């Protein structure tokens, strides 16, 4: 059984972490460092490559597709990116694919 002081101390720590997460500066696609921007574009290129395979949403390709999409979501959460910023990354990936 926790004492009142222990409970309050844990609540303050949790609130501090939540406040830090909320106040974390959100980045747009163009504000990202080059390394992170290239990483995000490469994730979208991988996603498009997997989607181009037959049966991409089922069978063997479903697991890698889900893994790449989860990496994209984690990346967006880490930098506080909006859907518009992710759309910009997808556009950059499409340009890179078209240029190849």
From Swiss-Prot:
Residues 1-10 form a propeptide. This is Internal protein II. The record marks 10-11 as: Cleavage. Internal protein II, which has a histone-like character, binds weakly to other components of the assembly core during an early stage of bacteriophage head morphogenesis.
């Amino acid at each position: 059984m926790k004492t009142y002081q222990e409970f309050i101390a844990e609540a303050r720590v949790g609130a501090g972490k939540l406040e830090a997460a909320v106040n974390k500066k959100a980045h747009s696609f163009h504000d990202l460092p080059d390394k992170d921007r290239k990483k995000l574009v490469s994730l979208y290129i991988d996603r498009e490559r997997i989607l181009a395979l037959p049966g991409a949403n089922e069978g063997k390709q479903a697991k890698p597709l889900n893994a790449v999409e989860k990496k994209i979501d984690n990346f967006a959460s880490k930098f506080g990116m909006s859907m518009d910023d992710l759309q910009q990354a997808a556009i950059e990936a499409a340009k890179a694919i078209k240029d190849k």
